[in-house]
Every structure is written in structure tokens, then in C-alpha cells.
Amino acid sequence: MKLTTVLIVAVLVLAACQFTVTDNSGDDTENPSLRSAGENQNPDSTKTITARATRARTNMRRGLSRPSKGCIGGGDPCEFHRGYTCCSEHCIIWVCA
């Protein structure tokens, strides 16, 4: 029982850390939270992002996805512990922001 509680707390702490990590470069133009609210209200955009992320994930597994800039674009899958591989340096729930 105690082990389960400790594991749950550890997972919650790691998840919270993922959301609190910020880019300290001083350039706020890349920050997705500063975009206008109307930009994300299209219901089709979720399907497009999901399809693109699925396609990119499949290509990454096959070794076909090689970003030209040396970083992963927004909406593409990433590894949360390697957020620096995203162009925005923000990997939220395994997707580059």
C-alpha cells in the first residue's frame, strides 16, 4: 500500500515537473501559451495534429524522419525527457509544443 502511494506521488511529481519547465531564453515569441485563443478553436485542427503526429511517429520508428533544422517541429512526437530536441524546446505529453 505504501509502495503504491509512493509510486503514484512520484508519477504526479514528474508530471507536474513536465508542465512547470520553462524556457529561460527570454524570447517569448515561441511560447504557445501567448497565442490568441481563437487559433485553437477549430475542431478539425485536433484531427490534423493527431494524424500528423501519428505519421511522424511511424516515420521516426522507420528511421525516415530527419528534420532539416536538426529539431522536431510543433505537433510532432518527442521524448519528454529530451525536450531540447523540439524546435520550441517544449515537449508536453510526448508532443512538441
UniProtKB/Swiss-Prot annotation:
It is found in: Secreted. Residues 31-45 have a biased composition (Polar residues). Disulfide bonds join C71-C87, C78-C91, C86-C96. Its main location: secreted. Transmembrane segments: none annotated. The keyword Hydrolase does not apply. One of its GO terms (molecular function) is toxin activity. Keywords: Cleavage on pair of basic residues, Disulfide bond, Ion channel impairing toxin, Knottin, Neurotoxin, Secreted, Signal, Toxin. Residues 23-60 form a propeptide. Residues 23-49 are annotated as: Disordered. The keyword Disulfide bond applies. It comes from the Eukaryota. One of its GO terms (cellular component) is extracellular region. Expressed by the venom duct. The presence of a 'disulfide through disulfide knot' structurally defines this protein as a knottin. The cysteine framework is VI/VII (C-C-CC-C-C). Belongs to the conotoxin O1 superfamily. Probable neurotoxin with unknown target. Possibly targets ion channels. This is Conotoxin Cal6.1e.
